[in-house]
C-alpha cells in the first residue's frame, strides 16, 4: 500500500544515494586523491568551545556551519569567490576566517572535523530566497530550513557553496584546516523542526533530500576523493517524533 511504501523511503534513499555515488565516482575524477585519515579514539563532541574540546582529548568534532552567513549575493570584490560554469559566487570573508580558526585549531591537533551544513533564516531576504527551501513554513518552530535545490539559482548556489568549502577545507595543503566530512542538514526526518520544507509526505520529502544529497556529494567529490558526505537522522530511531504529525516528522528506521 502507499503508506507502507512511504515508510521505507528513508531507508531506500540511502541505498539509492550510494548507488548514484558509485556511478559518479567512476564518471568524474576528484582533484585531490588521498586516503581517509585515521585516529586512535572514538571520543567526539559537537564543539562550541574549541579549547575545551582539545583539553578533553576529543578526536572527532562536529561544527555547525551556517550557509546564510557564508553567501554574499552583493559580490563584494574583497570577498573570496568561486567560479562555476562561468558564474562567480562570493563568500563572506569574516565568517570564513572565523570557521577557519575553529577548524584549523582542531585539525592541527589531529582531530577529525565534520561540518554540519545548515540553512538558517537570515535577516536578508535575498539570501533567504537563495538558500532556503521555497516551501519552508513561516510558522516553523526554529529558524532552520531545508536547502533550496528547487530553483535554478538555489541549486547553482548550493553546488557552488559545497565545491568552495570542499576545496577550502578538504585540500591536501590544509592551510585553512581540514574537514573530513560534510553532514547535510540536521535530523532531517524531523524536518518540521530542523530542516523545514513545509508540510510534506515522506515520499516527497525524501525525493527532495535525495536531490540535495546528490548535488552535495557530486560537489565534494569533484574536489576530494575521500571526504565523506552524510545524511542526518534524529535519535528517535524507529518511532516518529511524537510532537509532530505525519506531515512534520517521520520515523528514521521503519
What feature does the model see in each segment?
Residues 4-10:
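Positively charged n-region of N-terminal signal peptides that target proteins for export
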Residues 6, 170-173, 224:
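Secondary-structure transition/hinge residues
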Residues 11-21:
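Bacterial N-terminal signal peptides
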Residues 23-26:
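Sec/Tat signal peptide C-region and signal peptidase I cleavage site
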Residues 28-170, 174-177, 181-183, 189-201, ...:
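N-terminal substrate-binding region of glycoside hydrolase catalytic domains
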Residues 161, 166, 204-254:
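Noncatalytic carbohydrate-binding groove/subsite architecture in carbohydrate-active enzymes
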Amino acid at each position: 500500500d502507499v503508506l507502507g511504501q512511504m515508510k521505507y523511503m528513508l531507508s531506500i534513499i540511502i541505498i539509492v544515494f550510494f548507488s548514484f555515488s558509485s556511478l559518479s565516482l567512476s564518471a568524474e575524477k576528484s582533484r585531490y586523491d588521498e586516503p581517509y585519515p585515521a585516529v586512535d579514539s572514538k571520543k567526539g563532541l559537537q564543539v562550541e568551545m574549541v579549547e575545551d574540546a582539545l583539553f578533553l582529548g576529543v578526536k572527532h568534532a562536529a561544527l555547525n556551519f551556517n550557509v546564510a552567513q557564508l553567501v554574499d549575493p552583493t559580490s563584494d570584490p574583497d570577498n573570496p569567490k568561486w567560479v562555476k560554469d562561468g558564474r562567480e559566487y562570493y563568500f563572506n570573508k569574516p565568517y570564513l576566517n572565523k570557521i577557519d580558526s575553529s577548524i584549523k585549531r582542531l585539525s592541527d591537533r589531529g582531530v577529525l572535523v565534520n561540518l554540519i551544513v545548515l540553512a538558517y533564516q537570515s535577516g536578508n531576504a535575498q539570501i533567504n530566497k537563495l538558500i532556503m527551501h521555497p516551501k519552508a513554513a513561516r510558522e516553523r518552530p526554529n529558524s532552520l530550513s531545508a536547502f533550496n535545490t528547487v530553483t535554478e539559482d538555489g541549486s547553482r548556489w548550493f553546488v557552488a557553496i559545497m565545491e568552495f568549502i570542499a576545496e577550502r577545507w578538504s585540500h591536501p595543503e590544509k592551510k585553512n584546516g581540514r574537514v573530513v566530512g560534510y553532514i547535510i542538514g540536521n535530523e532531517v526526518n524531523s524536518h518540521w523542526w530542523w530542516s523545514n520544507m513545509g508540510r510534506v509526505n515522506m515520499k516527497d520529502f525524501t525525493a527532495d533530500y535525495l536531490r540535495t544529497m546528490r548535488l552535495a556529494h557530486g560537489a565534494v567529490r569533484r574536489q576530494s576523493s575521500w571526504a565523506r558526505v552524510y545524511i542526518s537522522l534524529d535519535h528517535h530511531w524507529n518511532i516518529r517524533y511524537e510532537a509532530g504529525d505525519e506531515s512534520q516528522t517521520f520515523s528514521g528506521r521503519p
